[in-house]
Amino acid sequence: MQKLLSLIIVALVLYNIAKLKISSDDNNATIIEQASVNNSANNENQVSINNDPPVSLNGNLFERTISKIVINALKTEEGKAFFENILQPLNKPIDTKDYTIPVHKDLITSLFKINTIGTGNVGPASCGHVVTVFYQISDMSNNLISEDTKTFTIGSGAVMLGLDNVIVGMNVGQAREAIIPAKYAASVGANNDNADSAYRVNVMLKSILPQNFINSNEVKIYDNEIAYRIPLLCGEKIAFNAKITRLANGEVLYDSKAKGQKVDMKIGDITYPLIFSYALQGKVPVGTRTVIAKGQTFKALGSNINKIISQESLPLNEYLMLEINDFK
């Protein structure tokens, strides 16, 4: 444990040093570039020095190697999300009254740089809902690529996987703006010259079906382990063990481990309990996630088929406990 903590602290220090160095070098590059432009009026062929300058690193070979890894990681969206989310828990005060970890709050918001506008009046949308949205997709220079009003199932990737995950958690009437990394915009990138570019997205939610919602204040979620990796997203496939227990008397209603067969599902599959997709989207696949919610959230979305538990036998108004782990 001590070695792990030391490694995390070293990573944090390197992260902050790298940010300071990159910021300093960018500022220096700007000053040098301006001076160069002023002194080269008679030389149109002078090479611009606005390229990324090499970062001067100090320390021994190991320290320089780690620093280079950190700096290269910071150039990617996934790397930025990784390091930013290491810092978040350390910068927050400990609240002994509430140890729950919001499912869709930190990692997803950071990954897609989501900004929500308005409050809306119906929702929130979960992975698996059928939604109608108006969206605009632009490149990073704000050149419009496409816009449309479309109806689709969240998790289907009908437009692009990143858009589906931005919509999760929205209410009807709300708008969001986000930046989608190229990895989660493959269908859009395939039609553009620069397939590795990120995209700006603006989306407004117009309707949700069916109107069967999970409100975060009615669900308690606990993780026994935290790891800073890219989280699971709506529309991805994952295998895991799941156990459902009736809190009133401890009766086990479902246990995949006892059955000897893991649950293998696409997040957003409406033939599985809605609470499964809700708990999985935004979860880093390590440890055990424990969810406490009413039985009605264990119903499958808009379907009489429930691959986990018979909907007729569900105690809708009782609290159940879901445990998911052994991710693969």
Swiss-Prot record:
Q: Which domain of life is it from?
A: Bacteria
Q: What class of enzyme is it?
A: isomerase
Q: Which Gene3D superfamilies match?
A: 3.10.50.40
Q: Which reaction does it catalyse?
A: [protein]-peptidylproline (omega=180) = [protein]-peptidylproline (omega=0)
Pinpoint the PPIase FKBP-type domain residues. Answer: 128-225
What does the UniProt keyword field contain? Isomerase, Rotamase
Q: What is its EC number?
A: 5.2.1.8
GO biological process assignments? protein folding
Report the coiled-coil segments: none
Extract the GO molecular function terms from the UniProt entry.
Answer: peptidyl-prolyl cis-trans isomerase activity
**InterPro entries, from UniProt?**
PPIase_dom_sf, PPIase_FKBP_dom
Q: Return the protein name.
A: Putative peptidyl-prolyl cis-trans isomerase RBE_0327
Origin organism of this chain? Rickettsia bellii (strain RML369-C)
Q: What is the lineage of its organism?
A: Bacteria, Pseudomonadati, Pseudomonadota, Alphaproteobacteria, Rickettsiales
